[in-house]
Amino acid sequence: MSKRPVIESEKPAWHDEDDDNMVVAVPKKVKMTMRVELKRTTDEEHGELDSKEYVGRLQEAFRKRHGGTPKWAKAAAGDEEEGSLLKTAAGYLAKDVNLPKTTIHTTLIKDFNIGHRYTRGITVVKFHKTRPVLIVADQGGNVQLFKVSREVKKDRFLQSANFSKFPIDSLEIADKGHSVICSSSRKEYLMQYNMETREVTQLKPPNTVPKQGIRLFAISHDSQFLAIAGHNSHIYVLHATSMEHITTISLPANASEIKFFPSHSREIWIICETGQIVIANIGLPGTKSSQHTFTDDGAVHGTTLAISQHGDYFATGSDTGIVNVYSGNDCRNSTNPRPLFNVSNLVTAVSSIAFNSDAQLMAICSNVKDNHLRLVHVASQTTFKNFPERNGKVTHARCVEFSPNGGYMAVGNDDGRLHVFEIHHFTDY
């Protein structure tokens, strides 16, 4: 029997056109272990999917459950005739992209920002969504752009801007990727920097927003809305371009962190200093805003939050170092959701949390102690024991983020150091 390599692009032996038009109703009540894997927070209320989407979710859930494609499900090289007859429409030859839970292979890129390092603490690291660029902001009012590429070995610096007497606390990418907007707790206005024209613009909130320093703000994914956290337990929602005041959200306490839901420009998730979580919907013109509130499990003082790209997971951090990971669906639908799991490796206040694009990997850090940076394998609910390396030192990590496809992770530190790691399992930027 002749041998040949199995080709992934081969077509199934038959194709039923009725399968393409089939609509599948996703059950509203499923087991906890399957709920996150099959349902999406962006699904319509009736929960109907086309067959291709449903099959894709089943396959993804299976691979996550079993830590990859099991040996019996992988095709081996065999007879051409035999292979063409036995192959089914299920597409079992999909590439295994699941992250192993035992060890993670990373490389620290040495001297990433050599020649362009400041001594002021780095407060924000952001990867551009469509261009291989890392954006770094610090308490000296500096915004720097670096090229992210395996081909670039030396000078990765692209450009920078400095805002005098404007220590940056928050930064968001705006204008559909063309600009960044920065805020400072010492100033009552925002600064916008156009990365293409290098123009700098001062953005003043309207008079309906109290004049106060802006430590914290967020921008929706479509750059339509901008939310500013006030000092009086309020969130002020503005049009990002006109700065028109749209609505005000009242909170049980001051906000520690705010984020727009990744795919819903009118939905804001907030963690309060006292541990309450508020999910607020801005509402359409002429309608009232609505909100849903619950208390983070075991939290006394909330510090930060993160939402996975598809909203399947929601993570919170507290001053005790505990990170709770919830199902996004549970948070929406329950007034007392229970975490899927929690991570207790940090013993000091959590400063930042980030999910990679497919939510297989979560990074958590604290800027109170050296080397308080951990990587979590989400499916197995465990941390990688080989990260960070014993001989490596990450000083007082304040902020962390993954590149769009997970190939890189950036960590900003209080002493101005910038650490950029290659995550070898994910080869793309």
Curated annotation (Swiss-Prot):
Keywords per UniProt: Nucleus, Repeat, rRNA processing, WD repeat
Primary role: Involved in nucleolar processing of pre-18S ribosomal RNA.
Gene3D superfamilies recorded: YVTN repeat-like/Quinoprotein amine dehydrogenase (2.130.10.10)
GO cellular component: Pwp2p-containing subcomplex of 90S preribosome; small-subunit processome
Entry-linked InterPro entries: Utp18 (IPR045161), WD40/YVTN_repeat-like_dom_sf (IPR015943), WD40_repeat_dom_sf (IPR036322), WD40_rpt (IPR001680)
Superkingdom of this protein's organism: Eukaryota
Protein name (database record): U3 small nucleolar RNA-associated protein 18 homolog
WD repeat intervals: 117-156, 295-336, 345-386, 392-428
GO process annotations (BP): rRNA processing
Localization per record: Nucleus, Nucleolus
Annotated SMART domains: WD40
Pfam family, one: WD40
Entry similarity comment: Belongs to the WD repeat UTP18 family.
